[in-house]
Amino acid sequence: MSTYVYGIARSSHPSLPEKMGGIGDPPQPVRILVQGALAALVSDAPEDLRPKRRDLMAHQNVLAEAGAGGAVLPMRFGGISPDDDAVLAVLDEREEHYLERLRALDDKVEYNVKASHDEEAVLHRVLADNPELRGLSEANRAAGGGTYEQKLALGERVAAAVQQREASDAVLIQEALQAEATDVRPGPESGAWLANISFLVERDRADGFVAAIDKLQQANHHLVLQVNGPLPPYSFVE
């Protein structure tokens, strides 16, 4: 049977969740595979593994339980090896790399921040910051909306200004938060977000990081911030 891998820790980790229920129906018990200075948290892999909510939560719960007692390199959901021996071989081959990453992630968590614009609020912000656009908008309004060509020209200029604002706000968000983090990773780009950034934060500085997010939001009401964390540091495993 194939082996499902949740994460990698030091073999000296004090509280790895052996026999905890993992993925599968019924839940497969978590096992610990030890190779030298490393240990892998694994279980048997179901043949029909899919990203169902129950299994996603089980994966997360195993990592949360292990992470509460020490550094763990989290694997993303769906990591399967042919068997236990294949897992042990990887631990042996990449021992120094994994130990270096464990040292780098000791007592740290990940926060992911996604940002978008409140459409109405950002339009007000763009017009407030651009006297020329504001004048054109007011002139169109005074003329009963303006001609079709005037409306089109104004709309194009406003759209360009909003796009520029997206780029500058992405920079603003990273600069406002990175001082509270030890590392930063950009996430996958999406048309739904103007920024998708993961921050590696020391556990004892998490309150300061959250406070920086609150301060950023209070100063920029046109931003819609979606914050997810604290999380296992998926984006920083490398």
UniProtKB/Swiss-Prot annotation:
Q: What is its main location?
A: other
Keywords from the UniProt entry: Gas vesicle
Question: Which Pfam family, an example, fits this chain?
Answer: GvpL_GvpF
- What does the UniProt entry say about where the protein is found? Gas vesicle
Biological process (GO) annotations held by this record are: gas vesicle organization
Q: What induces it?
A: Gas vesicle production is induced by growth conditions that promote production of secondary metabolites tiancimycin A and B.
Additional facts recorded: This strain probably produces some gas vesicles from the probable gvpO-gvpA-gvpF-gvpG-gvpJ-gvpL-gvpS-gvpK operon; it can be induced to produce more under certain growth conditions.
Protein purpose: A minor component of the gas vesicle, may be involved in preventing GvpA aggregation during gas vesicle nucleation. Gas vesicles are hollow, gas filled proteinaceous nanostructures found in some microorganisms. It is not clear what function gas vesicles perform in soil bacteria.
Record's protein name: Gas vesicle protein F
Q: Name the source organism.
A: Streptomyces sp. (strain CB03234)
The taxonomic lineage of its organism, from the top, reads: Bacteria, Bacillati, Actinomycetota, Actinomycetes, Kitasatosporales
UniProt gene name: gvpF
